[in-house]
Amino acid sequence: MVDSVYRTRSLGVAAEGLPDQYADGEAARVWQLYIGDTRSRTSEYKTWLLGLLRQHGCRRVLDVACGTGVDSIMLVEEGFSVTSVDASDKMLKYALKERWNRRHEPAFDKWVIEEANWMTLDKDVPQPAGGGFDAVICLGNSFAHLPDCKGDQSEHRQALKNIASMVRTGGLLVIDHRNYDHILSTGCAPPGKNIYYKSDLTKDVTTSVLTVNNKAHMVTLDYTVQVPAAGQDGPPSLSKFRLSYYPHCLAPFTELLRAAFEGKCQHSVLGDFKPYQPGQAYVPCYFIHVLKRTA
């Protein structure tokens, strides 16, 4: 339905099933350059995530949107037992390559990587003994990739229910989304640096909002990225690609998350890794939800 009104992705990207917006391979390659490796993660993000997981005694972590594996690699290096899944085989190949290259390291030899779909996650990923993972992470605005094809958010509810089912009692779900409240009210993303990536390759990001029947239905981001030349002497080139997102606003997404846990959770919201208060002066780029299953 979404493609009948507006082209949601770069040409060549798969249109059936759970949309893989990186299926043409080129978008996945450019995205890998854009986000970089573990060294490209901001120190604030790394310190926050590792501190959160260790504070709650998390050891077994499920990354349900691992992409190229950059977060999972960081967690494996830090001693966590990691299972990494993604719906895009083009993205997973980078994670698989890293695991192969470091297979002689015991931690990487034990790293589990699987292709999986949020809509069937409970069937695609076996739970560890003890009734679930200590922590499930879905970061980098990943969940917003899932569109609302039926117009009733039933896919969102099912996917979140499946993701929540992987969290053990006392375990955490850490999931985020861009500040779509600000994007929808202003038409632009909040000013400020990316809290996750230190990439200096981004030359431009253009934001568009699609409204259907007076309701925001989709946000597209058109990236222009400077790609380094293959050789030492060649000039860099500019690559363009488009990604589309469902605009999850803070209040309704909070309701979806609590429903996924049937209300049996503790829930807190951060704005760019800091406690968030509605109406505060600072406008965050991302909202991060931390939910702890209570029963």
Swiss-Prot record:
Family: Belongs to the class I-like SAM-binding methyltransferase superfamily. Glycine N-methyltransferase family.
Binding site for (6S)-5-methyl-5,6,7,8-tetrahydrofolate 2: 6, 217, 242
Entry EC number(s): 2.1.1.20
Residue list for modification Phosphoserine: 10
UniProt gene name: GNMT
Function in brief: Catalyzes the methylation of glycine by using S-adenosylmethionine (AdoMet) to form N-methylglycine (sarcosine) with the concomitant production of S-adenosylhomocysteine (AdoHcy), a reaction regulated by the binding of 5-methyltetrahydrofolate. Plays an important role in the regulation of methyl group metabolism by regulating the ratio between S-adenosyl-L-methionine and S-adenosyl-L-homocysteine.
The keyword Transferase is assigned to this record: yes
Record-given protein name: Glycine N-methyltransferase
